[in-house]
């Protein structure tokens, strides 16, 4: 039975919804009352000529091979902190803003069901190509309005409560132990450097960890079963989708008018991943039924089993979305953490000192209790997110008319909130070009934390629509970094002046043959 329409599915999350409803109504009234004729119109917002902008992405154009960071930075220099990105080929315009007051205004007026457009190719596939699978359940990535609210309410307790992660501490540690052995196998015995394609190994580690949560199984792609065809299909498609989304939904594309080769590849990719996911979850269901028939008491603690209790269709969709949203972004973040620590050996030594107090031996187990005492580890990861921002920011569609930077922006307008760019500006972060995990810790003399605008540090989004996988990513990152730095001293002896580029999300622009030297004690 599909319980999404049941009382249970809509009753979860009542508290936050009520409070956000009253807050959103108040914000809407304030925003509406503040709009006057003195404000400039939407048409007066600076913007490039649509056809010149389109030509800039064509062969020989200014932005032909540019990352999203490069061309938005160029636009910001020309037009200022707010401008319109022209829509074309069936895609509407969107506003880009780098003003913290604008960012706050949009979030304060997003309502109880925030709308995030921008993944049209995935939405089209789910609504028109495979409605037999998705139907009314589009997943958190693609759904909007009340449908999104019901789904989010139903699955929020599964992902957002810390107790839901307890069962994963030990298996995640085991996966990382396997990764450590893999590093020892592939590193050069003389230089101790890993191969140039080490980012593929990192992606396999992240895929293995997320696959454990999404599919209740280890795929074996790190060492044991590297050629598993089903696992490889999921692995490759999860990495391809973001790149294809960037080409279809961010760069100018005619896929809404004609079926382009890139869109056809996207359709094949989404179909392939869906077929494998359905096959794997059917195997899980069959195994679960056998256990029931054998009289075994089933304790549904895993995230997947709890999702299947809601609706098997929800389980399929969420399992895929975990991989699509998580593999590339988390793998790049892990590469960035290792790079930051290798280029700042004093910070690496300080982190290892903290880890030694929690993990006296290399094979010490990590658990819910001892991982509470790792403030410097969390500060390192948080500072890496600031130092190498993952993307430009968050997209929202205005739920009502708002004033942004003095301009009247009508309801229904999509706005790109460029908060991540602000994390590298001295206005908000002193010494922004320095890697300083200490900025996130309490001052040892005053006991106070750094004061920073909450609308400049939003790596996982904000409000009801913030990333539902945040706790999963936090656990994976903390476990992996702790295990690696406890076991190895990490170095990087190459140029790292421009190590990453931002397409849809941040991705490596260079190879990462890190040097891993064993820690003796």
Curated annotation (Swiss-Prot):
Gene3D superfamilies: Cytochrome P450. Keywords: Heme, Iron, Membrane, Metal-binding, Mitochondrion, Monooxygenase, Oxidoreductase, Transit peptide. Its EC number is 1.14.-.-. The keyword Cell inner membrane does not apply. It comes from Drosophila melanogaster. This is Probable cytochrome P450 12d1 proximal, mitochondrial. InterPro entries: CYP11_CYP27_families, Cyt_P450, Cyt_P450_CS, Cyt_P450_E_grp-I, Cyt_P450_sf. It is found in: Mitochondrion membrane. Its cofactor is heme.
């Amino acid at each position: 039975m599909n319980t999404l329409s049941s009382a249970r599915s809509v009753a979860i999350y009542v508290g936050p919804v009520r409070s956000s409803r009253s807050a959103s109504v108040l914000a809407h009234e304030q925003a509406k009352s503040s709009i006057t004729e003195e404000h400039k119109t939407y048409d007066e917002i600076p913007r490039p000529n649509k056809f010149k902008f389109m030509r800039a992405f064509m062969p020989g154009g200014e932005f032909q091979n540019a990352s999203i960071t490069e061309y938005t930075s160029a636009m910001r220099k020309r037009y200022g902190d707010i401008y319109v990105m022209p829509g074309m080929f069936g895609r509407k315009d969107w506003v880009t803003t780098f003003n913290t007051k604008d960012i706050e205004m949009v979030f304060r007026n997003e309502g109880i069901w925030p709308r995030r457009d921008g993944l049209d190719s995935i939405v089209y596939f789910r609504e028109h190509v495979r409605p037999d699978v998705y139907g009314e359940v589009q997943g958190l990535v693609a759904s909007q309005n009340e449908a999104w609210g019901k789904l989010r309410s139903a699955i929020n307790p599964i992902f957002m409560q810390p107790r839901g992660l307890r069962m994963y501490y030990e298996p995640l540690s085991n996966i990382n132990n396997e990764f450590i052995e893999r590093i020892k196998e592939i590193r050069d015995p003389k230089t101790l450097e890993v191969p140039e394609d080490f980012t593929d190994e990192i992606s396999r580690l992240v895929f293995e960890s997320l696959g454990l949560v999404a599919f209740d199984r280890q795929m074996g792609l790190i060492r044991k079963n590297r050629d598993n065809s089903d696992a490889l299909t999921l692995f490759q498609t999860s990495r391809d989708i973001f790149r294809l989304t960037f080409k279809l939904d961010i760069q100018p594309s005619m896929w809404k008018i004609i079926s382009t080769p890139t869109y056809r590849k996207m359709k094949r990719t989404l179909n392939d991943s869906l077929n494998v996911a359905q096959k794997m979850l059917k195997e899980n269901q069959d195994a679960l039924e056998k256990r029931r028939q054998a009289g075994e008491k089933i304790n549904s603690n895993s995230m997947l089993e709890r999702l299947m209790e809601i609706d098997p269709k929800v389980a399929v969709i969420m399992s895929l979305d975990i991989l699509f949203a998580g593999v590339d972004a988390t793998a790049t973040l892990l590469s960035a953490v290792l790079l930051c620590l290798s280029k700042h050996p004093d910070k690496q030594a300080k982190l290892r000192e903290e880890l030694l107090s929690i993990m006296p031996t290399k094979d010490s187990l990590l658990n819910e209790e001892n991982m509470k005492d790792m403030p410097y580890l969390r500060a390192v990861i948080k500072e890496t997110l600031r130092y190498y921002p993952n993307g430009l920011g968050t997209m929202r569609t205005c739920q009502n008319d708002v004033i942004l930077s003095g301009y009247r922006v009508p309801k229904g307008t999509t706005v790109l909130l460029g908060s991540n760019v602000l994390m590298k500006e001295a206005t908000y972060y002193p010494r922004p070009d320095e890697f300083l995990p200490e900025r996130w810790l309490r001052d040892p003399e005053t006991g106070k934390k750094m004061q920073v605008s909450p609308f400049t540090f939003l790596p996982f989004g904000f409000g009801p629509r913030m990333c539902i996988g945040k706790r999963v990513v936090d656990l994976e990152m903390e476990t992996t970094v702790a295990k690696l730095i406890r076991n190895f001293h990490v170095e990087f002896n190459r140029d790292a002046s421009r190590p990453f580029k931002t397409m849809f999300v941040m991705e490596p622009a260079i190879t990462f043959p890190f040097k891993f030297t064993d820690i003796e004690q």
